[in-house]
Each structure stands twice: as C-alpha cells, then as structure tokens.
C-alpha cells in the first residue's frame, strides 16, 4: 500500500498535511498530500509502492502533533455496491495476514458520523469474512496489526492496517472520557486526556500518584486543579480569580492570589507543573523554560494557544526555541512531546519531562 491515512481534527488538515510532508521527507519517503478543508483527514500518497509500510513502522504516531491516528491505506474504494460491500474490501486487504482486530471508522465530522450506525452493524459480517479470508485471526490479539476500514462517505472507504505498537488504542484515535459532574470546567478533560496521552498506563501509578505536590498556574476556576486533586495530589493553585469552593473544601488546595507569571514556589519538592493560560504561546513557553532552568518541577503539562495562520510552523518554532534555551542553560536531559488533543481546540498540549531516566527524590 502506498497511501498513509491520517485522522485529525476538522479544520486542521493543513497543519497535519504540512507535518506529514516534512516528517515523511525526513525518512526519505517521497510523496504528496491530498487534503480538503474540514474533511478531518489527510492522505499522504507515497511515490513508491509499499512505502506507507515504512511510515507506519518507523514514524512514531506519538511524535506527530496533529495526527490522532494513522494507517497504511489502499487507494480509495469507490462505488461499493450496496448488495455486496464486503467482497471488494476483503479483496483490498488480501495482503494483510493474521491481524488481531478490525475497526470500521469514519472521520470526525458530523457528515461522516452519520454513518456510525451503519459502521457498527457492518463490522460484524465484515469481521466474519476477514476471518475466513485469513486477514483476521479467529480471536482478537492486541499484539497483532489492526485492520482499519474508514468510510469517508456512503460506498466510499479507505482500507488498510496499522501496527499495534505504533497506533492509538482508541477508535478513530479519540479517547472516550466522561465529564465529571463536579468538575469546575470542561477544560478539566484536557488534562485528563493529557495524562493518558503522555504517561503510559504502566507508569501512571509511579508518576501520577497520591501525595505528590503540584502547581497549577492560571488555575481559576480549577478545571486542571480538579484532575490533580482527584488523583490525591496537594496543589498550589495560582490565579487572581476565584477558585471552585468544593475544590477548596478538600483541604488539598492552597490558593495563591497572584499572577502566574510572577509566582515562585516556596517549596522545591514539586513534581507536576500544569498551566492552561490564555496567553501568547511564546510567553507561556518562556515561563515554563524559566521553571525548568530553576529546577522547580519534574514533569510539566501546558497548553500553547495557536495563532490563526502558520500554526504548525509557529508551534515547531516555539518547541525548537525551548529546547535550545534549555540546553544553553544547562538543562540537557529532558523529553518533550506535543499533541493536538481531542479536547484541545485552537491550542496544543505540551509535555516536558526533566531527567526522565533519573528517579524522583
């Protein structure tokens, strides 16, 4: 297969396209992008047959900012007959052997999601035929490749596969998170999703645990503080505005009525720093850089608001500058990740982990 199919948020196709064009080029996989505004997906068509396999193997999904999920894909199947949509799909997947799972999906648009009920019903007979053809194992296996069938419209679908060790565990790349009734704001879901995105499940007990100290800059009314509190942390919430009363009643939050850009922590045993302020992204990045250089945290999660234009270019420039400044100031052991999360809109979420190979004291 020579196509790479990438799911993204509707309206961010240009950013996703610019990113995959650059990243594929770094792996010497030539090709061109096919993308339309508000389709919520991008197709990167490689010049060489089977080159998409190189990308799904060697390009880490977690290293892509704007792609939620990706898979090596066939050419678009069109005019699938209502009487038998399955046969052309099974034929297009003939080179896929012993996959462990099949997902019948759509792009994340209102128009495409109208096909969701059909996709659920269609999955059952398709699964049976794929088992008969040998493309799918009789029993689900999380270690085997995943078959993707993505309907972009009635009778029109891309089909292909991803590798389970380089794929989102979520259907369409979207985590299904529930808004807690007592959360102070919907922004709470951003940090909830970020923890799942940036901290592997098997490490969460160690890195996101009860009793830790955390700081939330720009905390009001407490959406992100809520996620820290529910995980048993003690939080210094910094904001001139009021905090949610129920959060304050937990006894786990100390409210500092200060400007987040001027606040300095009294204690130096802070593990988590979080920040979701409506500010220019470069200014927020400079703030996090200062905290990192001072060694005031171990891990940070923060949001960068995106400009209206050149969003991919702006984000990559800020991240590159951040890494340069940290290194120039003696901070050389760190890991940076960035993702346009499902619960993000005109922003991206960044994770900065200082001394990732050194235990927290």
Swiss-Prot record:
PANTHER family associated with the record: RIBOSOMAL RNA LARGE SUBUNIT METHYLTRANSFERASE M, RIBOSOMAL RNA METHYLTRANSFERASE FTSJ DOMAIN-CONTAINING PROTEIN
GO cellular component, one term: cytoplasm
SUPFAM superfamilies xrefs: S-adenosyl-L-methionine-dependent methyltransferases
Single GO MF descriptor: S-adenosylmethionine-dependent methyltransferase activity
Substrates-to-products reaction catalysed: cytidine(2498) in 23S rRNA + S-adenosyl-L-methionine = 2'-O-methylcytidine(2498) in 23S rRNA + S-adenosyl-L-homocysteine + H(+)
Keywords from the named record: Cytoplasm, Methyltransferase, rRNA processing, S-adenosyl-L-methionine, Transferase
Sequence similarity: Belongs to the class I-like SAM-binding methyltransferase superfamily. RNA methyltransferase RlmE family. RlmM subfamily.
Gene behind the chain: rlmM
Gene Ontology biological-process annotations: methylation; rRNA processing
Predominant place of localization: cytoplasm
Residues noted as binding S-adenosyl-L-methionine in the record, renumbered to the chain: 187, 220-223, 239, 259, 276
Gene3D superfamilies: 3.30.2300.20, 3.30.70.2810, Vaccinia Virus protein VP39 (3.40.50.150)
Domain of life the protein comes from: Bacteria
Entry EC number(s): 2.1.1.186
Function description: Catalyzes the 2'-O-methylation at nucleotide C2498 in 23S rRNA.
Oligomeric form and interacting partners: Monomer.
Name of the molecule in the record: Ribosomal RNA large subunit methyltransferase M
Active site positions, chain numbering: 305
Lineage: Bacteria, Pseudomonadati, Pseudomonadota, Gammaproteobacteria, Alteromonadales
